[in-house]
């Protein structure tokens, strides 16, 4: 069985949903690094929460411990799947502000209930269809990597979709297809 995946019209793909928002990326590996750099180059301030923050610091990011980074409007989990559940429950969930949105780069943790955000916390997916190094390279070339976008749960202010659209735009995916 197949499902039709619509391409989002370009006029819906703007950076507006993230303007004035505090953005944190948890993890600075393959995808986290690319998302952080592309969002920064799109004009946003990004804080990196990482177990090993040295590389992010060297790349010019403000870094902090994960539990402090979780105090953001958009908290992007760029961690290996096997670590997401424990880090979320111990360090992120207790520190999420009311109405925040969790961002996922792949949907395993949400789909299988490893992470179940409370009501009022958004859960969105922006999943580029390529490795982080390609997401970054295409962005710097003025191109992009197509991405899948989904809203699994709305946030308190019903802005999860606008945040996801802005995130996809900020990493360059809107240039080629979301």
Regions found by a protein language model. Name each.
Residues 21-35:
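Glycine-rich adenosine-cofactor-binding loop
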Residues 34, 40-59:
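NAD(P)-binding Rossmann-fold cofactor-contacting core
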Residues 22, 45-47, 122:
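Residues at the starts of beta-strands that form the adenosine-phosphate
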Residues 1-22, 50, 151, 172-178:
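Glycine/serine-rich phosphate-binding loop and adjoining beta1-alpha1 elements at the start
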Residues 44, 96-100, 119-121:
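A short helix->loop->beta-strand "cap" motif at the edges of active sites that frequently abuts
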Residues 103-178:
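Rossmann-fold dinucleotide-binding core
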Residues 60-65:
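Conserved SAM-binding strand-loop segment of SAM-dependent methyltransferases
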Residues 67-112:
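Rossmann-fold NAD(P) dinucleotide-binding segment
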